[in-house]
């Protein structure tokens, strides 16, 4: 099944709806990327909330528009809070997204993520090694860094999407977004995006927020990937290295005009 190139015109249309809705996105993410993730969502027009306590996470997940579960700094107590939030989101029909950080390298998080799959995530976003591990096709990887090309993990992503009935995103130089039947490719971005901490985790939050939009989930999630790629390209042109890239990236998200970028390319 060959992937189709995602349409930027659709990404522009989706961004207008995203900014109008400003989805309240409950981010249960890792300690390293909290601020960057929140700022990424704010710059694009969403409303982030970083609620992590088990007592608060369960009721909040039910009133949010979307939920992100990122296991980057997973602990036993945090796992309890995440499970409570996911169960609440599932009952409330709130779409939730899983970011299975380093799932192939560590057994505790692998078992936790596999257990959560029964609660039907709307989307899963990971690198090739993480998607291969979650699908059961391979274990390994070195933490958040992938040892596989995204294309190599595409069959695993398609099988996982079909099995769980969700959207699966495999990210690297080219992102692949699949629902198991149809697959979209999103090229772009810049190598500087891999030289700062948190762009993948922030993308997962944007993917989660996009799942709150009406319409086809596959197209909405692919649009989220497109926005981040375009902002990365624009930021790289205005920065001299990782230190100046971060503020340039947030500015690029804030000023993102997909239609103008489409005309330039």
Swiss-Prot record:
GO terms for biological process: thiamine biosynthetic process; thiamine diphosphate biosynthetic process. Catalyzes the phosphorylation of the hydroxyl group of 4-methyl-5-beta-hydroxyethylthiazole (THZ). Pathway: Cofactor biosynthesis; thiamine diphosphate biosynthesis; 4-methyl-5-(2-phosphoethyl)-thiazole from 5-(2-hydroxyethyl)-4-methylthiazole: step 1/1. Substrate binds at residues 50, 198. Belongs to the Thz kinase family. It catalyses: 5-(2-hydroxyethyl)-4-methylthiazole + ATP = 4-methyl-5-(2-phosphooxyethyl)-thiazole + ADP + H(+). The keyword Phosphoprotein does not apply. Its EC number is 2.7.1.50. InterPro entries: Hyethyz_kinase, Ribokinase-like. Gene3D superfamilies: 3.40.1190.20. It comes from Salmonella paratyphi C (strain RKS4594). NCBIfam families: PRK09355.1 (NF006830), thiM (TIGR00694). This is Hydroxyethylthiazole kinase. The lineage of its organism: Bacteria, Pseudomonadati, Pseudomonadota, Gammaproteobacteria, Enterobacterales. GO terms for molecular function: ATP binding; hydroxyethylthiazole kinase activity; magnesium ion binding. ATP binds at residues 125, 171. Pfam families: HK. Its cofactor is Mg(2+). Keywords: ATP-binding, Kinase, Magnesium, Metal-binding, Nucleotide-binding, Thiamine biosynthesis, Transferase.
């Amino acid at each position: 099944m060959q992937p189709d190139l995602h349409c930027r015109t659709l990404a522009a249309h989706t961004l207008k709806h995203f900014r109008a809705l400003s989805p309240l996105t409950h981010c249960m993410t890792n300690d390293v990327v909290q601020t960057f993730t929140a700022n990424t969502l704010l710059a694009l027009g969403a409303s982030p909330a970083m609620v992590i306590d088990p007592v608060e996470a369960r009721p909040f997940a039910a009133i949010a528009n979307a939920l992100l579960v990122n296991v980057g700094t997973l602990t036993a107590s945090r796992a309890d809070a995440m499970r409570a939030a996911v169960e609440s989101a599932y009952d409330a029909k709130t779409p939730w997204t899983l970011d299975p950080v380093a799932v192939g390298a560590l057994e505790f998080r692998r078992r936790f993520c596999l257990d959560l799959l029964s609660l039907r995530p709307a989307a899963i976003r990971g690198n090739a090694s993480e998607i291969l591990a979650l699908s059961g096709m391979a274990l390994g990887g070195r933490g958040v860094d992938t040892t596989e090309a995204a294309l190599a993990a595409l069959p695993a992503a398609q099988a996982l999407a079909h099995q769980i009935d969700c959207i699966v995103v495999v990210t690297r130089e080219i992102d692949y977004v699949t629902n198991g039947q149809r697959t979209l490719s999103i090229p772009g971005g810049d190598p500087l995006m891999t030289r700062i901490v948190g762009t993948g985790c922030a993308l997962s939050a944007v993917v989660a927020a996009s799942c709150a939009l009406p319409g086809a989930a596959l197209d909405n999630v692919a649009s989220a990937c497109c926005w981040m790629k375009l902002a990365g390209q624009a930021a790289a042109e205005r920065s001299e290295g990782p230190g100046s890239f971060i503020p340039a990236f947030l500015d690029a998200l804030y000023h993102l005009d997909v239609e103008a970028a489409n005309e330039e390319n």
